Amino acid sequence: MSFERTGSIFSGLAGAYVQREAHVVSLFPYAFPDENALALRARRMTATDSYPRSELSSLLEGYQRRLADLAGLEGSSNRAADQARRLAEANSLAVVTGQQAGLFTGPLYTIYKAVTCINLAKRLEAKTGQPVIPVFWVASEDHDFEEISHIKLLQGEKTVVITMTSRPDEDRFAIGHRTLPEDLAVTLESFLSHLPQSEHRLPWEETWHRLLTGPTGPHEHFAALLHKLLGPYGLVILDPLLSGLKQLPRCASFFASVLENEVSLREGLSRGVEQIRRLGYTPQVEKGPEETSLFYFHQGRRLAILRDGRGYRLRGAEITFSRDELLDLAQRQPDLFSTNVVTRPLLQDQLLPTTAYVAGPGEIAYFAAYRDVYRAMGMEMPPIVPRLSVTIIEGFVDKLLERYALSFADVPAGLEGRLREELAAQDELGIGALFEELESQVRAAYLPAVERIARWDRQMGNLAEENLDRVIAQARFLRQKVEHRHRQRCQDKRNHFRKVELHLWPGAPQERVYNIFPYLLKYGSSLIETLLEAPVEWLDSHCLFRC
């Protein structure tokens, strides 16, 4: 297994950020990648002594042990729990990332975010001499079930979709308030039927079957799998719906503070959005005039809180609050409240001494608008570090690249042009030239006769022209048939090019489409261990991972 560095595949604002273009970097309080900036942030976090380190550490240590039990790892050492315990130390720091709770861990990039988080935490701990804990924030409060409900696998020469169903009575429920689907066993059997047989499969099969009943919902199913996969490397998983979390000192007052500062938050976001627009990019987040930055849990459903005159109302429900009523609820019952895409990172950084946040390209574009949002809450946005970006190139695909003198850079734009070149090189008949010459000769032979007939009789001249068109059409029909037979003879080449595209760029970057487990079952834990060796210095690039 080996890495090769190539140009970043991030585009738009995120692409400009990883390439350190000054006009985009200026939107962020810290430059990337700048170890001195990370060290400065670490010193600032250490000087801030109001984080609920001890209480949060206790909650997270207990949660890592629960995840170990769910995954069948009870009795073994639990490095994630050990790391959670280290968070209680007075000078501890955190590197944070997060993602939705995707089915069977979702797309590959979820794993790459977690791996980057572990790597960066290890690097910063070595530099600062302080405990630096890698934390993965599961987006259990998100209510977009469609986004997490399916994964894609490559089966032969086609992509298959594995889906879990939702319960009709759980519409708009947060993922963390949903129960496991009744037909999860059916989903698992479909998943298993498309996975390779290997020596690494049985332990995972046992885990997947065990998780049909233990977790409380899809969020814990996801968290338990991620814990088994990366807990041994110290990844600490945080669920914002964890019992007791919103009662922690900094968390309990957070929602009331958001309501009290909503005007400043809205103005800060507007400034950030306008800056992005002036640079020629499309903002990823904008808010309507009545929208706040919070949701409210009502009868299980996660509903947006909207301004309504001097008070508030819930979208999709006939429920209103006065300002004082909502502020009182936020103080007394913070569990009723949930952040949105703007305030989620603020809550995260109220709880954790975040030294850096590991972000995907979409998140980078979001954070570009948030600097003044943080300031509105008296906070500073952490350094934003791009996640590891990877394409896995298996041996048989690498051989095809070599055979046809293709590079990875050829693949995203499509290989049709290169395929035509290959087919043309195999065209010993010279089909194009042959039929162009034939058509030219037919026209040369016909046209003098057509012209003489037209001079003799216009009506017969029209008939002669139609006759020429029919002859040309027959020649072109013959050309199509000859080309079709040529393509049949070249089908192996077509299949090879199709295979390269399906494996490396199936209509989008591989990391955004496929799941980790087909690769993990083929290559075992060495796959993860090699990913954990990816150089942090390469985060501004794309990595080709040959295995």
Swiss-Prot record:
Q: Which residues does UniProt call coiled coil? A: 462-484
Q: Which Pfam families match?
A: CC_BshC, Rossmann-like_BshC
- Report which superkingdom the organism of origin falls in: Bacteria
Q: For this protein, what is the EC number?
A: 6.-.-.-
Instruction: Cite the entry's keywords alphabetically.
Output: Coiled coil, Ligase
Q: Name one GO molecular function term.
A: ligase activity
| Entry function | Involved in bacillithiol (BSH) biosynthesis. May catalyze the last step of the pathway, the addition of cysteine to glucosamine malate (GlcN-Mal) to generate BSH.
Which family does the entry's similarity section mention?
Belongs to the BshC family.
Return the protein name.
Answer: Putative cysteine ligase BshC
